[in-house]
């Protein structure tokens, strides 16, 4: 039975569509994360540079191999997205030297130092001794956070881990045709794939040295992981592969694109291992720091205090 009469074309099309959609939105979580953190301390500049070079080679390769207009436009779209991330790196990291970092996103979390100096212990004692029976929600949250911080501080270790990196699923150009341009396009495809996979190396080193995944959006890795898996599934469930008499030649032609996407899956999985297990303590400390020293909560508490004072003054008069 022909492949076109079975379920595989539908599976391939669905996987291809899902891969395309997730690749389009993959960088948005990281852009939002950087904007909220106001810091790029967790990003390696060499990673971004290699990523950008991969975009450029992919765009040139798509042009030389005569890809469709939408594929070329997609390559330009990814190039613009990555350029925007590079712009964020320049603004927050170079221009402001990460000094705009919001609470909990400093190079090192502050809570271990506070615990070490006994400041959190003193603050907890003050809360216990001076607290009223009608404890405010703000005080309750701070007290819970301090207790948790003290517990975590006793279990902090300097465990090393396999570093990881963020991944990108950029525009994938199709198999090249004939001629010198095609050969050059094939070479550029391999170079682009190597850039995308190799870009992870400096980021791995960065994460390893920091012992933290702060500043890297987990949603970026979720979308790229899903994108890379569905991209490869779309290739191997397509009729072009299933009906091909020479599957080896087909795989050889597609190899740079398979390598560029499948080569990142292992790194994405390592990231989740780091994020949820190896460096979970660091993330917990940063979360507690945001809970303890959130400017919004402090402002709200100050506003309540001011209003209470005003009401008390009006009552006395």
Swiss-Prot record:
One GO cellular component term of this record is: fungal-type vacuole membrane
Q: Where in the cell is it found?
A: Vacuole membrane
Topology relative to the membrane: Multi-pass membrane protein
What's a single GO MF annotation on this record?
A: L-arginine transmembrane transporter activity
Say yes or no: keyword Metal-binding present. Answer: no
Q: Where are the transmembrane segments?
A: 14-34, 40-62, 72-94, 144-164, 185-205, 216-236, 250-270
Q: Disrupted gene: resulting phenotype?
A: Perturbs arginine transport across the vacuolar membrane and decreases cellular arginine consumption during nitrogen starvation. Resistant to canavanine; the effect is suppressed by simultaneous knockout of VSB1. Sensitive to nitrogen starvation.
Query: Which residues in this protein are found as Phosphoserine?
Result: 136
Classify the source by domain of life: Eukaryota
State the protein's purpose: Amino acid transporter that moves arginine across the vacuolar membrane. Active during nitrogen starvation when it exports stored vacuolar arginine to the cytosol, for use as a nitrogen source. Has been shown to function as an arginine/histidine antiporter when substrate is present on both sides of the membrane, but may also function as a uniporter.
Which named protein is this?
Vacuolar arginine/histidine antiporter YPQ2
Q: What is the lineage of its organism?
A: Eukaryota, Fungi, Dikarya, Ascomycota, Saccharomycotina
